[in-house]
């Protein structure tokens, strides 16, 4: 984010220097902004800072845990077996992507990261490392250490996703992939350890050709200041995941209806799908997707039957098909 701000400032300075932007016009725009700030804050009492910060943090933790989406859980690798050794790999475990960039940013009272709170959970942590760099640089020594750590662990928790440069306001994404260095490391880890739990952080839909590398995928989106403890609450079985996707995840960018018309060569953007936006397009065109709108697993399994669709709603019978999930049961180490 700091890099984006610096680039924006440099662009404005360069525009003034080369004559593309008049300094008087820039002064006028800044003046309008200052006037708006003064008008909105004049005579208003500042918000009370004497609030229960811990209670607010716990509320953020609860909201994050109830929002996270379990996309995959092969062979019930989750919740974690506390007896198995675990390697935690990924820059996002140390520097979480907990909120959006630009004007959506707010000041948290505190921010958790997974690496700092793991000791609060009854887990057998073999080791932790970044493995990849947030800015795309490659540290070969750390990468080798990550692969060696993964090779010697029973389970790998891999924290990855879109960084702040990949998605923000004021710019359009040029593709739907996560950074390639993260994918490369994930694929290499999968060659030495098949028990990978992917912890995904991203603010929008992405391509997931690498999903076969993971036995489980837990998607946190941008899960706030208490996202790390919320994630571990789900991984350890303290919370049963219940979140659902609010958008469709296509298999590839080429499946999206705007693919042929983006980026636009004109001054306007074309939305030729009309009312068939989002899930409406995929449902209508019968396109097979990676994960559909509304998808989400839990540690409990259900069946649906007797579906009745009426003008004012839907009726359906839901049957629990396994033992009601309350907490992870003890397992023998293998």
Regions of interest found by a model, annotated:
Residues 1-5, 9, 325-334:
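Single conserved hydrophobic/aromatic residue that forms the stacking wall/gate
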Residues 6, 10-102, 106-115, 119-121, ...:
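Secreted, periplasmic, or luminal enzymes acting at the cell surface/secretory milieu
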Residues 51-52, 125-212:
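Hydrophobic helix-and-loop "lid/oligomerization" segment in the mid-to-C-terminal part
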Residues 61, 65-68, 147, 151, ...:
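Residues within alpha-helical segments
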Residues 91, 162, 330:
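Residues immediately flanking
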Residues 154, 320, 332:
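Acidic active-site catalytic centers that drive phospho-/nucleotidyl reactions
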């Amino acid at each position: 984010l700091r890099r984006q701000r610096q680039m924006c400032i440099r662009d404005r300075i360069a525009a003034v220097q080369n004559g593309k932007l008049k300094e008087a016009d820039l002064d006028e725009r800044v003046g309008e902004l200052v006037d708006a700030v003064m008008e909105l804050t004049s005579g208003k009492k500042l918000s009370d800072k004497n609030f229960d910060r811990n209670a607010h943090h716990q509320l953020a933790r609860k909201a994050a845990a109830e929002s996270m989406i379990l996309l995959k859980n092969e062979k019930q690798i989750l919740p974690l077996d506390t007896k198995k050794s675990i390697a935690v790999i990924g820059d996002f475990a140390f520097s979480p992507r907990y909120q959006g960039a630009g004007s959506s940013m707010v000041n948290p009272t505190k921010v958790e990261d997974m690496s700092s709170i793991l000791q609060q959970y009854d887990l057998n942590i073999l080791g932790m490392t970044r493995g990849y760099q947030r800015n795309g640089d490659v540290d070969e020594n750390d990468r080798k250490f990550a692969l060696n750590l993964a090779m010697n662990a029973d389970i790998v928790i891999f924290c990855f996703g879109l960084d702040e440069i990949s998605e923000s306001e004021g710019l359009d994404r040029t593709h739907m992939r996560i950074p390639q260095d993260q994918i490369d490391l994930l694929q290499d880890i999968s060659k030495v350890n098949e028990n990978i739990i992917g912890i995904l952080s991203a603010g929008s839909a992405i391509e997931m050709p690498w999903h076969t590398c993971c036995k489980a995928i837990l998607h946190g989106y941008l899960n706030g200041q208490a996202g790390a403890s919320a994630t571990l609450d789900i991984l350890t079985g303290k919370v049963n995941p219940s979140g659902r996707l609010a958008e469709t995840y296509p298999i590839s960018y080429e499946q999206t209806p705007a693919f042929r018309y983006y980026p636009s060569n004109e001054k306007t953007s074309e939305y030729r799908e009309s009312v068939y936006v989002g899930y409406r397009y995929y449902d209508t065109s019968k396109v097979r997707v990676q994960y559909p709108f509304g998808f989400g697993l839990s540690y409990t399994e259900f069946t649906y039957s007797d579906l009745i669709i009426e003008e004012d709603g839907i009726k359906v019978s839901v049957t629990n098909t396994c033992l009601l999930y309350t907490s992870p049961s003890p397992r023998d180490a293998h």
